[in-house]
Swiss-Prot record:
Residues in the signal sequence: 1-25
Domain of life: Eukaryota
Propeptide positions: 26-34
Binding site for Ca(2+) 3: D222, D226, N228, N230, I232, E244
Positions of glycan attachment: N58, N206, N466
Alphabetical list of Pfam families matching this protein: Lipase_GDSL (PF00657), Saposin (PF20825)
Record-listed Ca(2+) 1 binding positions: D183, D185, D187, Y189, D204, D207
PANTHER family: ACYLOXYACYL HYDROLASE (PTHR15010:SF0)
Key words of the record: Calcium, Cytoplasmic vesicle, Disulfide bond, Glycoprotein, Hydrolase, Lipid metabolism, Metal-binding, Secreted, Signal, Zymogen
EC number: 3.1.1.77
Name of the featured protein: Acyloxyacyl hydrolase
Catalytic activity: a 3-(acyloxy)acyl derivative of bacterial toxin + H2O = a 3-hydroxyacyl derivative of bacterial toxin + a fatty acid + H(+)
Sequence segments annotated as region (Important for enzyme activity, localization to cytoplasmic vesicles, and protein stability): 37-69
């Protein structure tokens, strides 16, 4: 759930420190988590992929490295840089593979992974038959004088190597040029998809005018311009009445806003990036988008997704349902989620929420921090680092007060319970990870222990072989959910109604099983932790059904003019 996962994806692909230019500082995770631990994970993943590509295509390691480079997209000179890396470092990697060592040994030999004094040895694959020390000594001897060692030992970054300085310069420039010049934070709505653009909140329809944005009440019934970007504007020539007045007045338009974590933002590492049997140039086409979206896919999320899902599931996001119910709601969505977010830092998220109490339509706000209050990067005593019910109570009340001063009257806030993470271990521990499917050698138990050992596990409490720890984590999550339920039952606010909904995972599993699915198919394959796209859409379906049944006012009325809006304005300018 933490942002350094991005480092894991970008840096190993090139083994370059690109992350410093693409990531933004956030998270309040303990400072003990070091980015080189992610480099170790990244190295093991990439080396495994190279090894398996050679195996599947019955090719040399050299050919397999070049094959991987050929699959990478051209953006940011990724492909060129990859070939460069093969040219410089390939010979050493080949020499190591010749000695029949696994990815753990390769990465420890090249010092992308380091066993620190007094710390356990972290490995993904089973340990070699000969002793670890002996194997490593032997491997180290092979690459003693190699350029890659000069790099990893210098700690100064690969760009400090004279023969790579030029290409580094080129990559940095390419990244800089791919980022919109406009400061994406100062103006919250954007005409760009990524970097917190319209994948995250409704697309702006006039980038040069700050009084124009999705979710506002129409200015002068939008007779002359589309001030709220819902695609409805102008005057009906037949009777001189503005369309926005004719079709939307009294229709109770409203937006949807999610205050969430990586699950709400739909964190997802495509399994295609690691599955060699299917790997092709198509596998990495989405890499630049993914990286500039913090490895999140809000455009496909259960709450604010607006693109068609690639999964065969027919369920729609909450946003698309609200839009279908009342087409005046077009583009009124905000996914204010962040990897690593929890009740502890939700207040800073609210600062980036855009809602003007006087000018805008009411909103449905969903607070869904489903894990990070009990998940944290600390291996030593994870329980003491969890949010207590008292702390959660204080954090959430502060957040609600802040919301009360932001939201237009008539809004609704739904507090969502915490996840039931014990499901992860129960469902996955004996299954093979995508990386282990070819040779049946990496299970989720091994992945969890590898990540936990390196202190980069997104949730050591639940992603653990320790049954007692998993139970304690679940117990605390339940106490926190109960606290949220109590707050919703006892507190009143002037500008919104407050509700609580359980994270009813069992119901989602049952629904999925009725559709012929298996429980493990609801979890992200690569990280073995997050709910995947199917799960998120099933959750959205469940939430919608429950709200419609219990509190129908939250969703607003069905707009009888929907067919006319479609007739006059088509897809209303799309998303
Ligand atoms: Ca409009």
């Amino acid at each position: 759930m933490k942002s350094p996962w991005r480092i894991l994806v970008v840096s190993p692909l090139l083994l370059l420190p690109l992350h410093s230019s693409t990531s933004r500082a956030h998270d309040n995770q303990p400072g003990t988590i070091r980015s080189d631990h992610y480099t170790c994970v990244g190295c093991v993943l990439v080396v495994s992929v190279i090894e398996q590509l050679a195996q599947v295509h019955n090719s040399t390691v050299q050919a397999s490295m070049e094959r991987l480079c050929s699959y990478l997209p051209e953006e940011w000179v990724l492909k060129t840089a990859c070939y460069m890396m093969v040219h410089v470092f390939g010979a050493d990697i080949i020499k190591l593979f010749d000695k029949d060592v696994n990815a753990d040994v390769v990465c420890h030999t090249l010092e992308f992974c380091k066993q620190e004094p007094g710390q356990p040895l972290c490995h993904l694959y089973p340990l070699p038959k000969e002793s670890w020390k002996f194997t490593l000594e032997k491997a180290r001897h092979i690459v003693k004088q190699s350029p890659i060692m000069k790099y990893t030992r210098s700690g100064a970054g690969i760009c400090s190597l004279p023969f790579l300085a030029k290409i580094c310069q080129k990559i940095k420039l390419a990244i800089k040029n791919s980022v919109p010049i406009k400061d994406v934070d100062s103006d919250k709505y954007s005409i760009f998809p990524t970097l917190r653009g319209y994948h995250w909140r409704g697309r702006d329809c006039n980038d040069s005018d700050k009084t124009v944005y999705p979710g506002r009440r129409p200015d002068n019934w939008d007779a002359h311009r589309d001030s709220n970007c819902n695609g409805i504007w102008g005057v009906d020539p037949k009777d001189g009445i503005p369309y926005e007045k004719k079709f939307c007045e009294g229709s109770q338009p409203r937006g949807i806003i999610l205050l969430g974590d990586s699950a709400g933002a739909h964190f997802h590492i495509p399994p295609e990036w690691l599955t060699v049997s299917q790997m092709s140039v198509n596998s990495f086409l989405n890499l630049p988008t993914a990286v500039t979206n913090e490895l999140d896919w809000p455009q496909l999320s259960g709450t604010t997704g607006f693109l068609d899902s690639a999964s065969k599931i027919k369920e729609n996001s909450i946003y698309l349902r609200l839009r279908k119910r009342n087409r005046c709601n077009h583009r009124d969505y905000q996914n204010i989620s962040k990897n690593g977010a929890s009740s502890r830092n939700v207040k800073s998220l609210i600062e980036s929420l855009s809602r003007n109490q006087l000018l805008d339509h009411p909103a449905i706000v969903i607070y869904a921090m489903i894990g990070n209050d009990v998940c944290n990067g600390r291996k030593t005593d994870p329980v003491s680092a969890m949010t207590t019910p008292e702390q959660l109570y204080a954090n959430v009340l502060k957040m609600l007060e802040a919301l009360n001063s932001h939201l237009p009257t008539g809004s609704h806030v739904i507090l969502y319970g915490l996840a039931h993470g014990a499901f992860l271990w129960d469902t996955l521990h004996s299954r093979y990870h995508p990386l282990g499917q070819l040779n049946k050698d990496v299970t989720y138990t091994q992945l969890y222990s590898f990540l936990g050992c390196l202190q980069v596990s997104p949730c050591p409490g639940w992603m653990s072989a320790n049954e007692t720890l998993r139970a304690l984590t679940s117990e605390r999550a339940q106490q926190l959910s109960e606290t949220l339920r109590k707050i919703a039952a006892s507190k009143k606010f002037t500008n919104f109604n407050l509700f609580y909904l359980d994270f009813a995972f069992q119901e989602v599993v049952e629904e999925w099983q009725k559709m012929g699915g298996q429980p493990w198919e609801l979890i992200e394959a690569v990280d073995g932790f997050h709910p995947n796209e199917v799960a998120l859409l099933l959750f959205a379906d469940q939430l919608w059904e429950k709200v419609q049944r219990q509190w129908p006012d939250v969703l607003g009325k069905e707009n009888p003019f929907n067919p006319q809006i479609e007739e006059v304005f088509g897809d209303q300018g799309g998303h």
